[in-house]
Amino acid sequence: MPPRTLADNFLVPGPTAIAELIVFLLILFIFGKYIVPFVNQKLAERQELIRSQFEEAKRARDEAEAAAAEYRAQLQEIRAEATRVRERAHEEGQQIIAEMKEQARREADRIVRAAEEQIQAERARAVAAVRAEVGSLAVELASRIVGESLADVERQHRIVERFLAELEERAQRQPAASDVVGGQQREEVHR
């Protein structure tokens, strides 16, 4: 191995060391004078941008929370209003149902009364027709039995009325089996 010289030692400055030092200091000066302030300015701008974005995000979050609270309050108010509307509609529906039931009941009562009146009128016509028929049959039968003419109208009327009164009296005392319907005695119209 050859002997080492002082020039081989890297710790010992060589002839270019002064030039290297001057270039290094010049680069350091340029960096310190132009590049570092530029980088610091850009870092400060970036820092300011991040800070403003953070504040804006915080403000937006606060506004969103306030809007959410307002939304919840409005939603609660809308739900309460919907409940009131539903209850009012239910009450109105119940009232309408009650009115319709009452109207239907009145209409049914009116129809029943009209039917009863019609039945009474039909019954009265039937009773009158039966009385007339029974009267003429009774007069004819009585004429045959007695063997004399009962042409006198006044006399016929008295006989028929007496005969019908006796029939009605018997019917009231002993209701016939055909007069019982569903366990209840039918009403007899006596006129």
Swiss-Prot record:
Keywords, ordered alphabetically: ATP synthesis, Cell membrane, CF(0), Hydrogen ion transport, Ion transport, Membrane, Transmembrane, Transmembrane helix, Transport
Mind naming one GO cellular-component term on file for this protein? plasma membrane
Q: How does it sit in the membrane?
A: Single-pass membrane protein
InterPro entries (UniProt xref): ATP_synth_B-like_membr_sf, ATP_synth_b/b'su_bac/chlpt, ATP_synth_F0_bsu_bac, ATP_synthase_B_chain
Chain segments annotated as transmembrane: 10-30
Q: What is the protein's major site of localization?
A: membrane
Q: Name one Pfam family in it.
A: ATP-synt_B
Specify whether Membrane is a keyword of the entry. Answer: yes
The record's subcellular locations are: Cell membrane
Q: Which family does it belong to?
A: Belongs to the ATPase B chain family.
- Quote the subunit structure annotation: F-type ATPases have 2 components, F(1) - the catalytic core - and F(0) - the membrane proton channel. F(1) has five subunits: alpha(3), beta(3), gamma(1), delta(1), epsilon(1). F(0) has three main subunits: a(1), b(2) and c(10-14). The alpha and beta chains form an alternating ring which encloses part of the gamma chain. F(1) is attached to F(0) by a central stalk formed by the gamma and epsilon chains, while a peripheral stalk is formed by the delta and b chains.
Task of the protein: F(1)F(0) ATP synthase produces ATP from ADP in the presence of a proton or sodium gradient. F-type ATPases consist of two structural domains, F(1) containing the extramembraneous catalytic core and F(0) containing the membrane proton channel, linked together by a central stalk and a peripheral stalk. During catalysis, ATP synthesis in the catalytic domain of F(1) is coupled via a rotary mechanism of the central stalk subunits to proton translocation.
Cross-referenced NCBIfam families, in alphabetical order? ATP_synt_b, PRK05759.1-3
- For this entry, the protein name equals ATP synthase subunit b
Species assigned in the record: Acidothermus cellulolyticus (strain ATCC 43068 / DSM 8971 / 11B)
- Taxonomic placement: Bacteria, Bacillati, Actinomycetota, Actinomycetes, Acidothermales
Instruction: Give the gene symbol.
Output: atpF
